[in-house]
Amino acid sequence: MFLGSAGSGISGELRVVADEIELDRSDIGTSIFTDGMSGDITIVANSLKLNNGSSIFSATSTSILDDIFDDESVPDLLRRGSSGNINIRVRDTLELQGTNFDTNSSISSSVLGVGNSGNISIEASRLRLADGARILTQAENGNVGEINLRITGDMTLDGFQEIGFSQFPTSINTQSTGTGDTGNISIEAERLTLTNGARISTATTNSGNAGSIRVEASEILLDGEILENALQPQPTQITTDVFTENAVVTGLGGTLTLNADRITISNGAQISALTFSQGDAGSIAIQTTELQAIDGTISTQTFGPGNAGAIEIDAQTVRLSDGATLTSGASFPDPFNLEGDRNVGRGGTITVRASELLELDSGSQILGDVSVNTDSQGGNIILDGDRVRIRGGSSVTSSNFGIGNAGTVNLRANDLQIIGSSSRLLAEANGGIIVDPARFTDLIGGSDPTADLSSIIELTRAVGGTIAVDAERLEVRDGGTISVSSGGISEPGNVQLQIGDRLRLDNRGRIAASSVTGNGGNININARNIRLRRRSQMSAAGSPVDPTFDGNITLNTETLALLEGSQIVTSSADPQGGSNIEIRPWENDLVVLQSPDSLINATGQLAIEGDIDVQQPDLPEVDVVDAAAILATDPCATGRDSEFYITGRGGLPPNPESILPGDATWVDLRSPHTATPESTRTRDDETSQLVEAQGWYVNPEGNVVLSAQTANAEPNLPQPQPDSCSPNNSTR
């Protein structure tokens, strides 16, 4: 079914109303080939299926005139046209699947040439796309239409179409290849599922801006990846990209917003915003009750002069496991291309707010990084949660391997735990190298045998980020680490911990500031109680070989305990360096406990001791009382002044030293006259008569038995004999 025009004007509107519509290798479409507009398409049905390469399309192609006539002979007016809108309402299921040779099933509005593409709007109970099926709007030199999907039930995208050695994913996307802006994608669904390489994306490859993506659902699931050409994995993903080989292109990435009760990203799936040009990448905003990433990735990245976008997550619980990654960074596209532009944009800020739990496990990481051979600044990491757990080799890292500075790590929590070997909070700067490409060519080509490597390589200095933690309780144990470090001639940042209650380092837990050749960083800790156990350590260490000013360690605490081989140390190769350890009282109270095998030492490498400044608290004088004057030396004499008085039924001796009286073991205190209620006599009332106990005895099992017979009863229990009492015999 087709409406088209080869001339100017409007091709006409196409409207289809039916109970069930099924297309198999068939099309419904409108098109125009010169200036004008292809008509709108409206479809209303109970169910709609597009099978085996079938399509619904509205298309305009003005560029076809260039193939027929010489470019200069085609007036600009004839180069302009727009495609129509597509509106689909399906009461039950809309399904796109199957291919026909190299054609996949699709719904599209597109313009080839100059002009704007139309919008696509779909309402259905269920939507299913598979086998490389697509919903698409695109334009070359015009604005791209929007895609709006409103699905009351499940919406699924699965798999890909394989043509030759390439795989084309099932997708929903808007794309601009020219100066126009890309359209937005808006999705409302009960449950959105993307699997096996399926994709939702907006992209610009020129000066136009990429569109935004907004998803509202009860549950969002992204799972799996495919191998393109059997070599490179292509993840299941939701992404907005600024992608071009022309670095001067200024198109901006769109915002990616997800709002759902539960979001799961697993088995290589991704949520991303990327830029390869001067335009900034889009940002990612996620609001959910529960976010779980299992070997999944959430990423904003810049590979060009543009800046990476921010990542902002608001949730009750956030769990990253099995190598999952949350990252924002700056990377040089080809670090081995020495003649490339190293002016790479800044990394984005990562913000995670988890009102209940933020957990990283099994090698997962939150990472803000700048790669080698770049001149860029790292983004900051801000984490805010009630409980934060970093374990199983997981890490929160801000790093810079280029020329700029690393970002800071700010963490706020009521309860923070860093558990396990390689689990860490880390801010590091390693600097980089600047290479003169001309001299490098001479060196590796052998044309200049006298070339000196130092003449073409310039070491660069970077500055590490600061780690700032504000928590009620902090525990670092089982090899866990909080660390700022630097390599090359770079300098590390500082560690600043504000702990309201207690700081625990246990079983090789470590807080460190270290440098290879530069100055050391400082460690500043305010905590009411600090305890180091089982070979745990606080360390500020500068260069082991060069004269440097080492970092200081400053502790403000009420109680400091070093036990079982733990250490607080600084070291410096410079006799005039820092290497200070300062311990201050918390609110005028300070207690320092140190086991014999533990160490507080501020000695440099030349064994020149630094300053250990322990400020004594201003304590009031205490009167010491002689304990012998207030403790009794004769407990028996003291006991004679106390005894029990018999005022009830008996059963207790007069005092702890005496025995029970012989006869008075029970007294009946009940009134002698008890009213008897009137009742109807039954046969059971006449069968037996209660007899008052006349005595009692102890049976062989040690139980006391009340008995109506007294002939064989023992008159009394065996009575204990009173013990003698003396100061030397007080144990009963």
PLM features: residue spans?
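Extracellular and secretory-pathway beta-repeat/beta-biased strand scaffolds
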Residues: 1-732
